[in-house]
Amino acid sequence: MKVFCGRANPTTGSLEWLEEDEHYDYHQEIARSSYADMLHDKDRNIKYYQGIRAAVSRVKDRGQKALVLDIGTGTGLLSMMAVTAGADFCYAIEVFKPMADAAVKIVEKNGFSDKIKVINKHSTEVTVGPDGDLPCRANILVTELFDTELIGEGALPSYEHAHRHLVQENCEAVPHKATVYAQLVESRRMWSWNKLFPVHVQTSLGEQVIVPPSELERCPGAPSVYDIQLNQVPSTDFTALSDVLPMFSVDFSKQVSSSAACHSKQFVPLASGQAQVVLSWWDIEMDPEGKITCTMAPFWAQTNPQELQWRDHWMQCVYFLPQEEPVVQGSPRCLVAHHDDYCVWYSLQRTSADENEEVYQVRPVCDCQAHLLWNRPRFGEINDQDRTDQYAQALRTVLMPGTICLCVSDGSLLSLLAHHLGAEQVFTVESSAASYRLMKRIFKANHLEDKVSIIKKRPELLTSADLEGKKVSLLLGEPFFATSLLPWHNLYFWYARTSVDQHLEPGAVVMPQAASLYAMIVEFRDLWRIRSPCGDCEGFDVHIMDDMIKHSLDFRESREAEPHPLWEYPCRSLSEPQQILTFDFQQPVPQKPVHAEGSMELRRPGKSHGAVLWMEYHLTPDSTVSTGLMNPLEDKGDCCWNPHCKQAVYFLSTTVDPRVPLDGPQSVSYAVEFHPLTGDITMEFRLADTLN
């Protein structure tokens, strides 16, 4: 059956109705899931297996039957481990139907159908009794309900319900316990992901400073955690103000509460500085003795950094304090971890929690609009003074006496730069209510509410009256649009430029004047694992899961790229960067598709995992801003990526199909096409010897 789905097209800006298979959302969820990454997590799998063996042995040693409840079974892997370890029976709970169906097949393929019952329900809907899903309560509870924040996938309510209704009192639990750790740091780089810094502009009248509104200064920020690969943040980018502090633990073998709570930890600052950011991670102990431990600690907090396990389904957390606060070396303070049933947040106190009335009991929520409009990388981009200087320098070359400027980008400071650098009149278009309110506040804080005109409209709806009857001589964009996911989605600027063509004077300047799509073949250190089939996992055949993911990729994304922030995922270039397509913003969007095909020579040995694609914006003939590679490639091909943008990754067949040989091909062929009607870019990259 087909269904019609309405979607906003991020490139053209139009609402489209697409005919989709009724299961398209299932396929999308499977294709973009972390199942493959989890199966490749050797450390996780081994530790779970060890913990399950130990738990089954403890129950058997007491002369009891080992009855296992596995919540969130996924592939059924942990249940199969339990049966192999000697469990008498397993009840495997999986709420996602396609996954539950796959688990049934995997369990059958491995010969465990007589010992494992897969139940397609949410665990809170599972019943116990003669006519229930379970005939009696289980005495071993096995779960993998954790995310980077530990509790973000509803682990606490699920455990709370399981202990009340599904498992015996004092049951064995794998994992047995989790502990959340935190470290207070000062970091200008990370703080720039949360607050707007003053922006400095050199003008003919001297230095002008764009200041943030007081509402942004006071705002506690976005309520959500920022999860990143913290191992890719150099230790030179932050100063530790505290030791690593164990903030709180959860014993999964006993009754768990999902009620809101706070946990205070006193510490003595290691250095004086501005307390801004809390870095956090967790570990899980698989056994009561704490001998079998799986940790998410970054390299500097590891006892054996050389044995660091890469994983993407669990990373580390960056939390921002509501406000930065000075701490003094040697003067004790308290760090407080707060949590409700799904979220964690932090506050800093002078004394213990019961003596301080200013504890943030309620989760911080943005009230300034900026954190709703700008994500963390966007804050970093706006705070990048070198980038601002490049735009300012380009503006100086195109601004003329009497310039009438129109700025088209979401929540951009370019309109302020244009004003300070001498534009006679500046208009800026803000199509969303959030960006309109935010920019009003920024203009007011800088006493520019009468100097820069904000128009709350989509560009295609602009009228001559909106522009006070004037013709635009400079059309300006970064471009940045909040709805963009892939690098080329910001080509919406080109569509906006086309729709305002009637308002441009003859010979009007457009900045950027053009854009180019670049591609490069790379070998990833680790990212390839998220799309690589597993085959065998700890002795269990999971090919069915591999096939399921491949089918979903073929259904939806086999010819698509996916966005990844590659500064977090090291890779080596195997080819030189190659310009694939160019888009001339001086001209309207063409009517006919733009096609390019060719090949990329592999200049370095390695495994061709994928093609990375990014956009470069040519502000002027002499100034280009890259959303991808930031520096020329080093001899070994190590890449330095723009940290404020996500790049697009097209995984090659060598990654998703192990039958394709990794070595041998000397080039990669490509065919890329831009479709003006939809704004889509379709592509195919193939190793030279897989063309037939």
UniProtKB/Swiss-Prot annotation:
Any GO CC annotation of this UniProt entry: cytosol
GO biological process, one term: spliceosomal snRNP assembly
SAM-dependent MTase PRMT-type domain boundaries: 14-345, 358-684
Active site: E144, E153
Catalytic activity: L-arginyl-[protein] + S-adenosyl-L-methionine = N(omega)-methyl-L-arginyl-[protein] + S-adenosyl-L-homocysteine + H(+)
Pfam entry (one): PrmA
EC numbers on record: 2.1.1.321
Keywords: Chromatin regulator, Cytoplasm, Differentiation, Methylation, Methyltransferase, Nucleus, Repeat, S-adenosyl-L-methionine, Transcription, Transcription regulation, Transferase
Transmembrane feature ranges: none
InterPro entries attached to this UniProt entry: Arg_MeTrfase (IPR025799), MeTrfase_PRMT7 (IPR014644), PRMT_dom (IPR055135), SAM-dependent_MTases_sf (IPR029063)
Gene3D superfamilies associated with the record: Hnrnp arginine n-methyltransferase1, Vaccinia Virus protein VP39
A Gene Ontology molecular function term of the record: protein-arginine omega-N monomethyltransferase activity
Sites of Omega-N-methylarginine modification: R32
Family affiliation: Belongs to the class I-like SAM-binding methyltransferase superfamily. Protein arginine N-methyltransferase family. PRMT7 subfamily.
Primary role: Arginine methyltransferase that can both catalyze the formation of omega-N monomethylarginine (MMA) and symmetrical dimethylarginine (sDMA), with a preference for the formation of MMA. Specifically mediates the symmetrical dimethylation of arginine residues in the small nuclear ribonucleoproteins Sm D1 (SNRPD1) and Sm D3 (SNRPD3); such methylation being required for the assembly and biogenesis of snRNP core particles. Specifically mediates the symmetric dimethylation of histone H4 'Arg-3' to form H4R3me2s.
Additional notes on this entry: Confers resistance or sensitivity to DNA-damaging agents. Down-regulation confers increased sensitivity to the Top1 inhibitor camptothecin (CPT).
Subunit structure: Interacts with CTCFL, PRMT5 and SNRPD3. Homodimer and heterodimer.
Designated name of the protein: Protein arginine N-methyltransferase 7
Source species of the chain: Cricetulus longicaudatus
Lineage: Eukaryota, Metazoa, Chordata, Craniata, Vertebrata
